[in-house]
């Protein structure tokens, strides 16, 4: 009998958002039969201690992630996770495979967005997709996935130095906001009937809000909620990556 897939999640410090994300991952793992182990370390954990833990988990677990954010001094340890164990898809080797169109671990949020588009009846083939935000976690890998053969979207990747952002967004059949700035995208920036994917999760005095303003609902044909939209899909794809090991 094959053993159940195993996933180790390493948390550094006590960030409330991290704790919430890990709880969601643990709940989903339990439902699908993945054995999840949570390793909780203090914020002042020395680099060597984290390196030793990662080295040990690389040998004993199927999947391994370090929950972000972590202190900048510890960020180089992310590259210590073996690419084959890197179910988050953050390792530079896995990102390199994505650039070349070689099979490998795909970052969970971009993979979840692609799955969400297909399952909601929004095949991106031939569509103009505008991605706002070029992080290596979401924006850049998503733009690569969308432009791959078989997906075949036409992609515009916007960032903090993009001129006339309003005009670029207005041309999108599908608009993805992944900036981390509350209510940055307004209805004046959206083409009537566009599909909106809101990746942002921002804590404000009014609670959690996305990168997309509520008034966009007046013009968009479909829009993902925050919370409860892209986030759950990210968790699902993490479990999928773990099961592929």
Predicted regions and their residues:
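Positively charged, low-complexity intrinsically disordered leader regions
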Residues: 1-3, 10
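Residues that mark the start of a beta-strand
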Residues: 4-6, 127-128
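Glycine-rich phosphate/diphosphate-binding loop of Rossmann-like nucleotide-binding domains
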Residues: 14-26, 72, 104-195, 204, ...
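Short beta-strand elements in bilobed, periplasmic/extracellular small-molecule ligand-binding domains
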Residues: 29-43, 155-157
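Short, well-structured alpha-helical segments in soluble
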Residues: 49-60
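Periplasmic-binding protein-like
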Residues: 61-69
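Glycine/small-residue-rich loop that forms an oxyanion/phosphate-binding "nest" at active or ligand-binding sites
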Residues: 68-111
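Rossmann-fold NAD(P)-binding glycine/threonine-rich loop
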Residues: 77-95, 192, 197-245
